[in-house]
């Protein structure tokens, strides 16, 4: 979720190879986007399974659950898979997944954005891909990094065992929960427990006092409902923590790639002390061993959430960059059809993932 302030600085465009390498019309086959649907899961997995990309933006479960809010679309082009979406009326693209000519695909995205009267905005660009982006886009490339949107990635074995001195406090939380609630049990998330999960989600939304925060969590609630309604089609794994017959917590997630699992959602009733720690440990300990890493997503700049995520000793913080390229040369502005008002974008693009 990356807020970016857009402003105009004369001379941003250059004659770098981003503009001149791909002059030949043979490269400019159009991107054929279509709305993301459940039928696209195998297509997305074909590209992400062995890509080694661990950012949560590429979890199909996330992409599908939030698709209505962002009008998410997908297309294949030149060996790449591309996602296009909107936030606050601004067009954006995820960093493409695949193999091929990076300059060609970035130019194709620029052409697509210009056709729709927008500058090119790339999100979810991990550090490993910045050299390709900067080489292709040159001086036209403007980069924004926001610590609030870095993904927390952990070793699965570490979260499952909670061993070592640094995680002693977490083991204490687990032991206290077991002492307070000796009748607790963990069960796999099945259709039987979906109504209780949705009820806990509803109470979580209603507990928010600030109206702006309520709207934000209401959007997440809709995404949760959508994901749980298509649990099997999305290949979700999940679990519920029960005290007696009352639900204390639930969680679910889905693969990002072959070795990384994304925990998409984790909710707990705070009346049950230690429920968050226990649901996390119980769930991760049951994940298949093929998942070396667990992505627990961003902290969004929330102080308490950041402290909690850091306390689990992440293996890495995966920084994600936003990259903006603007049509600033007069001829390009005219070719793209940008008006001065469209070109001088000065408002923020709200959180996308």
Residue ranges and their predicted role:
Residues 20-83, 336-337, 344, 353:
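Non-cleavable N-terminal signal-anchor transmembrane helices
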Residues 1-10:
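Hydrophobic alpha-helical signal peptides and transmembrane signal-/tail-anchor segments
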Residues 8, 16-17, 27:
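Intrinsic-disorder-associated, low-complexity terminal segments enriched in Asp/Asn/His/Tyr and depleted
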Residues 138-215:
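Acyltransferase donor/substrate-recognition loop-hinge adjacent to the catalytic core
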Residues 41, 45-71, 184-269:
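A conserved beta-strand-loop-helix scaffold within acyl/acetyltransferase catalytic domains
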Residues 57-129, 133, 242-270:
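Conserved donor-binding loop and adjoining core beta-sheet/short helix segment
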Residues 142-161, 295-353:
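Active-site/acyl-donor-binding loops of N-acyltransferases
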Residues 235-326:
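Aromatic (often tryptophan-rich) hydrophobic motifs at membrane interfaces
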């Amino acid at each position: 979720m990356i807020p970016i302030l857009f402003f105009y600085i004369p001379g941003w465009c250059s004659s770098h190879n981003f503009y001149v390498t791909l002059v030949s019309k043979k490269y400019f086959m159009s991107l054929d986007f279509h709305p993301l649907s459940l039928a696209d899961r195998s297509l997305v997995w074909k590209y992400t399974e062995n890509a080694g990309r661990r950012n949560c933006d590429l979890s199909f479960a996330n992409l599908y659950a939030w698709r209505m809010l962002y009008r998410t679309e997908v297309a294949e082009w030149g060996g790449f898979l591309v996602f296009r979406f909107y936030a606050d009326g601004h067009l954006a693209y995820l960093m493409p997944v695949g193999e091929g000519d990076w300059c060609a695909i970035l130019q194709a995205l620029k052409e697509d954005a210009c056709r729709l009267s927008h500058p090119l905005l790339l999100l979810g660009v991990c550090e490993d891909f910045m050299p390709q982006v900067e080489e292709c886009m040159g001086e036209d490339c403007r980069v924004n990094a926001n610590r609030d949107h870095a993904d927390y990635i952990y070793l699965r074995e570490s979260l499952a065992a909670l061993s070592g001195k640094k995680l002693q406090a977490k083991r204490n939380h687990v032991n206290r929960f077991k002492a307070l609630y000796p009748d607790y049990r963990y069960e796999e998330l099945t259709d039987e427990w979906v109504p209780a999960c949705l009820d806990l989600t509803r109470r979580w939304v209603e507990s928010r006092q600030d109206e702006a925060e309520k709207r934000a969590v209401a959007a997440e609630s809709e995404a949760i409902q959508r994901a749980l309604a298509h649990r099997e089609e999305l290949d979700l794994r999940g679990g519920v923590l029960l005290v007696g017959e009352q639900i204390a917590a639930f969680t679910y997630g889905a693969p990002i790639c072959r070795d990384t699992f994304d925990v998409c959602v984790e909710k707990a009733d705070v009346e049950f002390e230690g429920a968050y720690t226990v649901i996390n440990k119980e769930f991760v300990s049951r994940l298949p061993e093929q998942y070396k890493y667990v992505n627990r997503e961003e902290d969004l700049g929330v102080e308490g959430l950041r402290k909690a995520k850091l306390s689990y000793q992440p293996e890495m913080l995966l920084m994600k960059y936003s990259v903006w390229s603007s049509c600033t040369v007069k001829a390009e502005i005219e070719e793209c059809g940008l008006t001065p008002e469209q070109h001088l974008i000065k408002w923020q693009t709200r959180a996308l993932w």
